[in-house]
């Protein structure tokens, strides 16, 4: 079975200049997607991420896809977070997956800062009054990667951290009947799905999927 990295690098090598993603009317090539993702991977590793779940903050935009692929290249797993949705669910996801690293655009990171600032007492089980200084100290416990700043990093060259036994992503239920529950999908699960789809559907170059 191929690894997820082998799938990604194969598509990159075969279709560098072709569109990989189309969002609204803008197209992004495999080369654009691949190169920026590798810089995200380097940023994560240089900031201490290691085979753990990383939060991607955002929506369906280019930066979010870059973040997801960068996390996979770094040998980590991702879980999506939307700060505009239920605040308590967001807190439960962060606590449930023991998130220490967050990736997003500046505005999205700031939105999450606001949510966490409101919930410092919940995280620390604090019984005392929470001051602005307490909040600032709390937020600095986490690693925040602004996707606009990753250009300063070199693209990752060593892909050996990715393993079939690693988690690929964790998706959370809505939590409508209680706390949201995380569904874990391994790299092996994801690769098996890709293998099956590849056998079932022989998709031509340029075929669009959503």
Predicted regions and their residues:
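Conserved alpha-helix/loop element of class I SAM-dependent methyltransferases that forms part
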Residues: 194
